[in-house]
UniProtKB/Swiss-Prot annotation:
Residues 1-59 form the TGS domain. This is Threonine--tRNA ligase. Homodimer. The gene is thrS. It is an enzyme of class 6 (ligase). It comes from Thermotoga maritima (strain ATCC 43589 / DSM 3109 / JCM 10099 / NBRC 100826 / MSB8).
């Protein structure tokens, strides 16, 4: 029987049913093929093709290639661990690819792997790569799979969850794994890898299950790419907010008494207050009204909103006086209550409510991560209530606000629009009108965007913003979400020109997203060296010796009177030590006062990067600092 295969150049060829991509690659003279994409699905090079299809061969240069070779590298890792620690002592979890790498989970009898074990595992992996073992894909019955994995309890659990009676396994030498693929044709194709770290991970992510050992690694087709990625990781580690935050006395974490709930220290509160001040200024200019809603509200509110049915496991509850309350996980129901506290006319719209709202959401302890994944956080939440005809202009206003805020920190960003899913609520005509309004606003703002068809929330289309930091990482932050569900549930209406009630449109939006998470991103983006307007201490005044204290204190007082944050460092430490401390604390400016400065009335300024400017008029410095802070410059003015 023949099948038709359509190739990337548009040509259609006939082949015998069961032909493999490897055979097609040979016919086409493509010697470097490592796999294929068949009807959009990643496909092993030696896997038979049974039906008509579109086919594109994959080489190591193609964007799909990492999925093949990193998946295979995860199997090589598992094979190496089983060789080193004994098949009878190693129970296998799962070993998927992840962004920029892979991992495998192990349950090892009488012990756990540590990072000291990684070098010897790497050596064993190199042996397996050198052996260049053929990798074979095979479909077997569940009964055969149960027998094959009879000593692997985690695999047996997975087998039972697979639909149908057939499962896929992969074999390389003596190693066999339950896997859907895809994989390389053999173990020797990609040689450039590195094991990165070891951590604990609960089986299936549940704390009720055993704790396994997770080994992370990465792999690249070229050594140069691997080396560059390892340098990137080193730089990311240097910027890690979990390390810099405590070092710079910005925040602390206490996992014993408040896991996932950061404590902000005085210097960290300065930064948070500056972030909120900046945001408030922009919101006031754009007609937002700031409100403040309760932290705890009756359970009935959350039943109406739907959180009770769909989000209860992530909420915290309190029972008092035979009434049950919930600590709010979101701000929207509270904002709706404010809206509904009076009759709203179409002439009042749009109404823009804004709040720095503290919310609490339960997260498993295993996924908590510094300020990036917490249980208690503050959202810069706003809800816009408007008519359907006002959607486009309101979205355009939000887009401008987002651009203004992100530009202030030097972030570039990309935009994604997610549209109506199959299981949507509400009238399709309303969806169409709303989606068109979002597209029009994006285009009027001059923003290019990617459309994720069918990936919107069931209650409305949304726009997501992914900011790019100074070392190229992306963070999803701002969201603009149209909501057709909450106005229905809470009967959110306005009185129209016809003196009748009409359903209002509700737009959710956050820009920082989580204030705590955005703070963490900024720490890493700036490597702790905040622009002067954000810096907890803006100027350190350092007398050279005790006899210079009085003169230096006058300088410190003068600068402080102008509203700047000044640290007068007259500690009985060496001058070099105090300068190094100021640099370690990443204070933008240091003023050094000695005999020469006291005699001349001038000051010597040193920036945190080490640049020295002598004979500076104090008033000129104050004016320069004022302009730098008021304009919220990213760079230090005196380094220009």
């Amino acid at each position: 029987m023949k099948i038709k295969v359509k190739l990337p150049d548009g040509k259609e060829k006939e082949y015998d049913r069961g032909i493999t991509p490897a055979e097609i690659a040979k016919e086409l003279g493509i010697k470097k093929a490592i796999g294929a994409v068949v009807n959009g699905e990643l496909w092993d090079l030696k896997r038979p093709i049974e039906n008509d299809c579109e086919l594109r061969l994959v080489t190591l240069e193609d964007p799909e290639a990492p999925e093949f070779y990193r998946h295979t590298m995860a199997h090589i890792l598992a094979q190496a661990v089983m060789r080193l620690y004994g098949k009878e002592n190693v129970k296998l979890g799962i070993g998927p690819t992840i962004e920029n790498g892979f991992y495998y989970d192990f349950d090892i009898k009488n012990g756990r792997l540590t990072e000291e074990d990684l070098p010897k595992i790497e050596q064993e992996m190199k042996k397996i790569i050198k052996e260049n073992l053929p990798i074979e894909r095979k479909e077997i019955s569940k009964e055969e799979a149960r027998e094959l994995f009879r000593d692997q309890p985690y695999k047996l659990e997975l087998i039972e969850e697979i639909e149908g009676n057939r499962v896929t396994i992969y074999r390389q030498g003596e190693f066999v794994d339950l896997c859907r693929g895809p994989h390389l044709p053999s173990t020797g194709i990609v040689k450039h890898f590195k094991l990165l770290s070891v951590s604990g991970a609960y089986w299936r992510g549940s704390e009720k299950n055993p704790m396994l050992t997770r080994v992370y690694g990465t792999a690249f087709a070229k050594k140069e790419d691997l080396d560059n990625y390892l340098k990137f990781l080193e730089e990311a580690q240097r910027r890690d907010h979990r390390k810099l935050g405590p070092q710079l006395e910005l925040f602390m974490l206490n996992t014993e008494y408040a896991p996932g709930m950061p404590f902000f220290l005085p210097k960290g509160v300065v930064v948070l207050n500056e972030l909120m001040k900046f945001s408030r200024e922009l919101h006031r200019e754009r007609g937002y009204q700031e409100i403040f809603t309760p932290l705890i509200m009756n359970e009935q509110l959350w039943k109406i909103s739907g959180h009770w049915d769909h989000y209860a496991e992530n909420m915290y509850f309190i029972e008092k006086d035979e009434e049950r309350y919930a600590v709010k996980p979101m701000n929207c129901p509270g904002h709706i209550l404010v809206y509904k506290s009076r009759t709203v006319s179409y002439r009042d719209l749009p109404l823009r409510f804004f709040e720095f709202g503290r919310v609490h959401r339960y997260e498993r302890s295993g996924v908590l991560h510094g300020l990036m994944r917490v249980r208690s956080f503050t959202q810069d939440d706003a809800h816009i209530f408007c008519t359907p005809d006002q959607i486009e202009e309101e979205i355009l206003g939000v887009l401008d606000l987002i651009n203004t805020i992100y530009s202030q920190f030097g972030f570039t960003y990309r935009v994604e629009l997610s549209t109506m899913p199959e299981d949507h609520m509400g009238d399709e005509a309303i969806w169409e009108k709303a989606t068109t309004a979002l597209k029009n606003a994006l285009e009027r703002a001059g923003l290019s965007y990617k459309v994720n068809e069918g990936e919107g929330a069931f209650y409305g289309p949304k726009i997501d913003f992914h900011i790019r930091d100074s070392i190229g990482r992306e963070w999803q932050c701002a969201t603009i979400q149209l909501d057709f569900m909450m106005p229905e549930k809470f009967n959110v209406t306005y009185i129209g020109p016809d003196n009748k009630e009409h359903r209002a449109v509700m737009i959710h939006r956050a820009i920082y997203g989580s204030l705590e998470r955005f703070f963490g991103i900024l720490i890493e983006h700036f490597a702790g060296a905040f622009p002067t307007w954000l810096a907890p201490i803006q100027v350190a005044v350092i007398p050279i010796s005790e006899k210079h204290n009085d003169g230096a204190e006058k300088v410190a007082r003068r600068i402080s009177q102008e509203g700047f944050r000044v640290f007068f460092d007259n500690r009985r430490e060496t001058l070099g030590y105090r300068i190094r401390q100021a640099q370690t604390q990443k204070i933008p400016y240091m003023i050094i006062i000695g005999d020469k400065e006291l005699e001349s009335g001038k000051i010597s300024v040193r920036t945190r990067t080490g640049k020295e400017i002598k004979d500076v008029d104090p008033e000129h410095f104050v004016e320069t600092l004022r302009n730098e802070v008021l304009s919220r410059k990213l760079e230090l003015s005196m380094e220009g």
